[in-house]
């Protein structure tokens, strides 16, 4: 048999250059360090969000803060961003302002000082306030994405952990991480605290909790998380040793977290002389909905359910029943297999923060943003690997992000519903 016949009988397929190129890109991507991947994901998400922000800003009409079609920095400095600017420049009032009805009016004491302080420090470099506020927010969000990836790697494979970062970076309220808000700094502390808790590096929680308590509310919810963590470890101490020294450390950190959680209301009291100054300040924001009412724990969601149902023309009991269904659904969600993969500590946090909100928060237009510290749930959403699922959820979150920008963040005439 000739060589030609052998060659013709076993023809070799020429390599497809496009296929090789695709494989090369995949290989190069897989070989990148984890932090480079997270950086590229976060940057791509922020670029996408910036495009949407600019588009929505073009639709913005004149309002009490800006003219029509404001630039990016002006559009990113609406709503509560102005309160942070007021705090950064002028500090807090020594006397609580009063509304026409004699109750405490909306004022700067509702906002914690670390974010405006960090932004004011950045202005010492010569940056204008609005630019500094965005830079601090974007940088903190990037840090949160990096820490979240490390946290997810404790429970998920690398591709799933990275996809969790993708979902975090494009979530419906993720634009807040490039606006003049403290949320992204709060996300950083939440992610760091959970990572330290999972790794049982309890002592390092002290500075993180302290920073958290002066950035965003939620430290008291984390105190409950620490309590649940202690009970869990003590109950399982036979198979997972829980030495007395560690028990004392967890108790000490838990008590410190409780103190940190109450520190700001105590400071408001000390400066203004009004014992319930912080609580009354927070109640001012919900008075636009239900008028001035006392805070009774575990009732705000039912009040809100009744109000929203009546607002859309339904009986109040429909809204109250809906709240009950939501509460049961949230509790059941914690036991789904995908959520259980995240470990007990993350589930303790989800339960603690959910209970914290259920106890004191009145559901209003800012509900989506207030729910954002539940972001570790993206780990459960990242578990399925099917391409159709991943593309679908990415497109859904991007669509919801645009809806949040256009329907919640954009100011519409006389808009009393801050995002």
Model-derived regions: residue spans:
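Short hydrophobic/aromatic helix or loop-helix immediately within or flanking a transmembrane segment
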Residues: 78-97, 101-126, 295-305
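Transmembrane-helix motifs of polytopic, lipid-linked glycan transferases
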Residues: 120-121, 135-155, 328-335
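Transmembrane-helix signature of polytopic, membrane-embedded enzymes
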Residues: 131-132, 148-170, 342-348
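Membrane-lumen/periplasm interface segments of specific transmembrane helices
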Residues: 45-62, 223-236, 240-330, 345-350
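Loop-to-helix entry region of an early transmembrane alpha helix in multi-pass inner-membrane enzymes
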Residues: 102-109, 113, 117, 125-143, ...
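Multi-pass, polyprenyl lipid-linked donor-dependent membrane glycosyltransferases
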Residues: 136-140, 155-159, 163-197, 204, ...
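Transmembrane alpha-helix segments characteristic
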Residues: 339-361, 370
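Signature aromatic-anchored transmembrane alpha helix within multi-pass, membrane-resident enzymes
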Residues: 255-258, 386-413, 417
């Amino acid at each position: 048999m000739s060589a030609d016949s052998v060659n013709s009988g076993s023809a070799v397929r020429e390599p497809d250059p496009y296929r090789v190129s695709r494989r090369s890109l995949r290989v190069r991507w897989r070989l990148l360090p984890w932090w480079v991947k997270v950086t590229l994901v976060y940057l791509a998400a922020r670029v996408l969000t910036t495009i949407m922000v600019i588009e929505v800003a073009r639709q913005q009409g004149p309002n009490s803060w800006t003219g029509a079609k404001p630039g990016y920095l002006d559009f990113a400095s609406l709503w509560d961003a102005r309160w942070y600017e007021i705090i950064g420049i002028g500090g807090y009032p020594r006397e609580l302002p009063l509304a026409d009805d004699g109750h405490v009016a909306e004022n700067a004491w509702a906002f914690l000082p670390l974010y405006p302080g960090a932004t004011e420090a950045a202005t010492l470099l010569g940056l204008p306030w609005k630019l500094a506020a965005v830079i601090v927010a974007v940088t903190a969000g990037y840090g949160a994405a990096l820490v979240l990836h490390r946290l997810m790697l404790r429970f998920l494979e690398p591709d799933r952990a990275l996809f969790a970062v993708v979902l975090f970076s494009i979530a419906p309220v993720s634009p807040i991480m490039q606006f003049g808000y403290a949320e992204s700094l709060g996300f950083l502390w939440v992610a760091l605290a959970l990572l330290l808790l999972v790794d049982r590096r309890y002592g390092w929680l002290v500075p993180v909790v302290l920073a958290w308590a002066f950035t965003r509310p939620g430290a008291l919810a984390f105190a409950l998380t620490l309590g649940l963590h202690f009970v869990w470890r003590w109950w399982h101490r036979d198979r997972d040793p829980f030495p007395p020294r560690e028990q004392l450390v967890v108790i000490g950190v838990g008590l410190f977290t409780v103190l940190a959680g109450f520190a700001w209301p105590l400071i408001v009291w000390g400066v203004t002389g009004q014992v319930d100054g912080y609580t009354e300040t927070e109640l001012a924001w919900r008075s636009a909905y239900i008028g001035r009412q006392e805070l009774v724990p575990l009732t705000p969601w039912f009040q809100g359910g009744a109000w929203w149902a009546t607002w859309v023309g339904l009986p109040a009991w429909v809204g109250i029943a809906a709240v009950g269904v939501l509460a049961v659904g949230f509790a059941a969600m914690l036991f789904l297999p995908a959520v259980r993969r995240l470990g007990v500590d993350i589930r303790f946090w989800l339960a603690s923060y959910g209970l914290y909100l259920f106890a004191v928060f009145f559901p209003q237009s800012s509900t989506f943003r207030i729910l954002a510290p539940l972001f570790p749930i993206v780990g459960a959403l990242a578990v399925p690997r099917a391409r159709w699922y991943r593309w679908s959820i990415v497109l859904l979150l991007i669509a919801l992000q645009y809806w949040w920008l256009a329907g919640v963040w954009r100011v519409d005439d006389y808009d009393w519903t801050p995002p």
